[in-house]
Amino acid sequence: MAKKLLLSFLSVLFFLITTKVNSQKQINLDVDNDLYFNRDFYYSSGIFLSYFKPDKDNVDDLNRLTLGQLIYTPSMRYESNPEKYDYPYSGYLFLEYQKRKKMSSHSSYSLGGQIGITGNASLAKGMQNLYHDLVLNLPNLKWESQMPQELQLNLLASYFKGFKIKDNLNLTSELYSKLGTYQIMSGLERGLYIGDLSWLG
């Protein structure tokens, strides 16, 4: 039953992504998976389906709505004794809203919030085992002693600034923070961006 539900969910995602949208709007699907780098532990997977839409009252504001799922596993993922885990099994299913506001042609900030759930309701165990079954042909993970099922709330903030080096070559930086019941963190991302730099990051 769980496999059928997950396959249906993936089919709907594919349909949404391939559906043509107005050029002023955008749908993105981002997938993180550490098996791309031949490993599968700690931050194991992330799936993010996002919908972007300019604010109808101010074209310099961008609204983003994201449905996402995060999956974390211990390094010894086939170990059945939770006392030997170096990290708990954990899944997080969430809905996130952010509003990004333009500050200049190369900078912006965003504020937002996130509501989600951990535990069985996150669907993480089923999603990970389905991927292992269909794509990798690996045995199912037991998911012993996973993080309990609880409602989670987070506040989000970020600041983006781009620096033009020369035509179509730019440095980017983004300072971001999360504060709430699921995550408390802050970080700085730096990058090299090839293309026309904008305030969107």
Where are these regions (language model features)?
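Bacterial Sec-dependent N-terminal signal peptides
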Residues: M1-Q26
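Residue-level signal for the start and early helices of compact helical domains
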Residues: S8, V12, N58, L62-N63, ...
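Residues in flexible loops and secondary-structure boundaries
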Residues: F9, L13-F14, F37-R39, D57, ...
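Short loop/turn segments at connectors of secondary-structure elements within structured domains
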Residues: I17, S23, V59-D61, S105-Y109, ...
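N-terminal ordered "arm"
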Residues: Q24-L62
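Outer-membrane pore/translocation modules
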Residues: I27, L67-G201
